[in-house]
Design a protein with these regions (language model features):
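DNA-recognition helix of helix-turn-helix
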Residues: 89, 160-191
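Short, aromatic/basic-enriched loop-to-helix "N-cap" motif that marks the start
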Residues: 64-82, 100, 171, 176
């Protein structure tokens, strides 16, 4: 069953109560995949992206518990991005040292703040959509093939023709499946978006 009771504000407050373990698990489950996706989009390998996400989330918890995050001075997304950007830059620096040792160029450019915000927003939308799709699979009688068609189109960016061929469907049926699944996901996505809203008061 979908849990939409924990806003980011409530989770942050929960980090201070009863050791904050339950709140931390939800916060980590919510933001770790976004940080991993961000790191992947910036060219890190799957393992490096997972390491960056791990290091980022550990740092977030430590800084928050040390009182170093002040919500009145900035959005949580900006704080998370700042930590993630530093961790990603560390990986690039290590790579640059190895490149220089081999006599190769060590120049690396990390996107500016607006580009990072845009990537973050895209990754957050994908995480929310995946969570909503998992909820739909668990709680509805939507055909598995329709859900698979939606996944292939949206997450794997396959063409309608490819999806139709892979799933033994007509192209028209693929379009209809995508439309049906998207319609069913709309309300769940809206609920989840409110939970992921870092800027809520």
């Amino acid at each position: 069953m979908l849990d939409v009771t924990h806003t980011t504000t409530a989770l942050l407050q929960g980090l201070h109560s009863d050791g904050g373990n339950a709140a931390w698990e939800v916060l980590d489950r919510r933001y770790r995949p976004i940080v991993t996706g961000l790191a992947r989009r910036l060219g890190l390998s799957e393992q490096d992206a997972m390491d960056v996400a791990q290091d980022t989330m550990v740092r977030v918890l430590a800084e928050y518990r040390d009182g170093r995050y002040d919500r009145s001075r900035g959005r949580m997304r900006s704080w998370l991005l700042s930590i993630a950007r530093t961790k990603i830059a560390d990986v690039y620096r290590k790579r640059a040292v190895r490149r220089e040792a081999r006599g190769e160029s060590a120049m690396v450019t990390i996107p500016n703040e607006q580009e990072l915000e845009d990537i973050w927003s895209t990754e957050r939308r994908l995480v929310v959509l995946r969570e909503a799709l998992a909820e739909l699979q668990a709680t509805s009688k939507t055909a598995d093939r329709s859900i698979r068609a939606f996944e292939m189109l949206i997450f794997h960016r396959r063409s309608v023709g490819d999806v139709a061929s892979a799933l033994d469907m007509s192209e028209n049926d693929v379009y209809l499946a995508k439309s049906r699944v998207a319609r069913k996901l709309r309300d769940t996505v809206k609920q989840l978006e409110s939970c992921y809203e870092e800027d809520a008061p």
